[in-house]
């Protein structure tokens, strides 16, 4: 009788532990999005993006008469993404709207290079491809990144403020939104 109870307790504990471990492991179940600003940190398409950028707002700070770039990237550790498209909407500070003709979207292209040190090939960002119907429909291999760039341009007439908007990456019938923040400073 005691053996049956002990066996029942062991089986219950094993069932709870296995169910718990299955629900805790979530890495790679869905694509992750990353937001970051122009910096010296460039990431190749095979590199793991830093956790600090995951679901972070892509934030740029700029003065008047300047151009700055915010980056948004998507990656899925488990599966290939198809039909990947990038879009963005209006940016507003609640009072003013950032001029739409002063925002441009680009898809990052990557160049393959060889490292003599590591004796291996790697990729690094190479150029910006303007988004259009042809270039804005792509495939992202599993465990690779695809970055997109939003270039903002201010003029002397652009009102200072903190402009907020959304960028979206659609894929395989799904969609991920990420906040983009543009801080325009008037130093005159």
List each model region and its residues.
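Residue-level detector of short, conserved catalytic/binding motifs and their immediate flanks
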Residues: 13, 70, 165
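Extended acidic/polar, glycine-enriched regions
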Residues: 73-90, 135-188
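Sec-dependent signal peptide cleavage junction
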Residues: 17-26
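Bacterial N-terminal signal peptides
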Residues: 10-18
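Contiguous beta-strand segments within globular domains
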Residues: 55-78
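Bacterial N-terminal signal peptides that target proteins for export
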Residues: 1-10
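Surface-exposed binding patches on compact interaction domains or structured appendages
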Residues: 25-54, 78-150
């Amino acid at each position: 009788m005691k053996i049956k109870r002990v066996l029942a307790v062991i089986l219950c504990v094993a069932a709870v532990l296995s169910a718990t471990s299955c629900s805790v492991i979530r890495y790679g179940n869905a694509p992750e999005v990353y937001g970051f600003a122009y910096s010296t940190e460039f990431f190749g398409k095979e590199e793991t993006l830093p956790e600090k950028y995951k679901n972070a707002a892509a934030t740029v700070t700029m003065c008047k008469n300047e151009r700055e770039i915010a980056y948004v990237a998507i990656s899925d550790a488990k599966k290939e993404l198809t039909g990947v498209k990038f879009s963005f909407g209006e940016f507003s500070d609640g009072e003013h709207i950032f001029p739409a003709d002063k925002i441009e979207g680009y898809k990052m292209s990557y160049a393959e290079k060889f490292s003599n040190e590591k004796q291996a090939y790697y990729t690094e960002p190479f150029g910006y491809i303007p988004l259009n119907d042809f270039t804005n429909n792509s495939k992202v291999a599993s465990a690779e990144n695809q970055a997109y760039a939003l270039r903002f341009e201010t003029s002397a007439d652009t009102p200072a403020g903190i402009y907020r908007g959304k960028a979206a990456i659609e894929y395989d019938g799904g969609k991920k939104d990420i906040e983009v923040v543009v801080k325009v400073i008037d130093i005159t």
